[in-house]
């Protein structure tokens, strides 16, 4: 049995998830080519939707790193319906579209709860940008190439304290992450780190690709043979290593 395993003891962001999945897929060149194509010509192959530039290239195209996502309300926003339309009309494979749609369904529910909105009225700011949508699509594409029987995640560690956004300081875990936590069965823990380690798009990404928690007390790395491993860092310096990801054979 082939297992894709994410060790989230150092947190997770959307960029970290993309980097790790692309590296393990063995098709990183193709995936980043697709990212650059979408950034240059528009996600749907037409005009660029334009909410900030995509850098492309191996590593990160700047979709989220460990930024503050939708903690603030500023600049252009997109409705959930708009994002769904963009995903459906994109030139990514169907498996990538399905994963990205699941990611944004999770984010929409969380943001609606945080802001007292409905799925029809909720709007996205940072996570509604082209870069973030491309990130979700590319992650789905990468995971589809890995063709695993199971996707598993370790306990997920977030930091503590506060982070600063346009409205001032907010508590960590941030509100959207707290809302997402209510809709999954992952094991959440707190690290002795005074900043954000888990971003909404990182957690929603795990949920969107169908990752399940390991069984209590289970040590997959000891039980299974490691076929391939990688580590991916995000944009925020937490003083810890990055997201570790493995392809395991059991």
Task: Give the ranges of each region predicted by the language model.
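N-terminal phosphate-binding or glycine-rich loops at protein starts, especially the Walker A/P-loop
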Residues: 1-40
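Conserved phosphate/anionic-ligand binding catalytic regions in large, soluble enzymes, centered on
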Residues: 6-20, 124-147
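Acidic, glycine-rich active-site loops and adjacent beta-strand->loop/helix elements
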Residues: 9-10, 38-39, 128-130, 155-163, ...
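Mobile "lid/hinge" segments at catalytic clefts and subdomain interfaces of large enzymes
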Residues: 28, 148-250
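Short beta-strand elements
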Residues: 33, 52, 62, 143, ...
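Histidine-centered metal-binding segments
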Residues: 37-82
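Anion-binding (especially nucleotide phosphate/pyrophosphate-binding) glycine-rich loop
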Residues: 78-123
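Flexible, glycine/proline-enriched loop segments at strand-loop-helix junctions
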Residues: 89-98, 123-130, 162-168, 189-197
């Amino acid at each position: 049995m082939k297992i894709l395993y994410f060790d989230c003891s150092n947190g997770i962001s959307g960029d970290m998830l993309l980097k790790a999945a692309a590296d393990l897929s063995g098709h990183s060149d193709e995936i980043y080519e697709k990212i650059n194509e979408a950034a240059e010509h528009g996600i749907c192959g037409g005009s660029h939707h334009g909410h900030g530039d995509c850098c492309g290239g191996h590593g990160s195209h700047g979709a989220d790193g460990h930024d503050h996502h939708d903690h603030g309300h500023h600049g252009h926003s997109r409705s959930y319906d708009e994002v769904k339309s963009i995903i459906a009309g994109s030139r990514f494979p169907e498996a990538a579209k399905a994963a990205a749609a699941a990611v944004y369904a999770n984010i929409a529910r969380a943001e609606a709860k945080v802001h007292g909105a409905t799925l029809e009225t909720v709007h996205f700011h940072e996570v509604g940008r082209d870069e973030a949508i491309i990130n979700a699509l590319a992650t789905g594409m990468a995971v589809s190439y890995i063709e695993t029987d199971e996707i598993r995640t370790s306990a997920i560690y977030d930091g503590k304290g506060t982070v600063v956004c346009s409205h001032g300081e907010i508590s960590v875990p941030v509100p959207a992450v707290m809302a997402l936590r209510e809709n999954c069965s992952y094991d959440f823990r707190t690290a002795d780190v005074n900043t954000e380690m888990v971003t909404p798009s990182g957690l929603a990404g795990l949920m969107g690709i169908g990752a399940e928690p390991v069984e209590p007390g289970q040590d997959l790395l000891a039980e299974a043979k490691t076929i391939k491993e990688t580590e991916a860092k995000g944009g925020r310096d937490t003083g810890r290593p990055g997201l570790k990801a493995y392809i395991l054979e059991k």
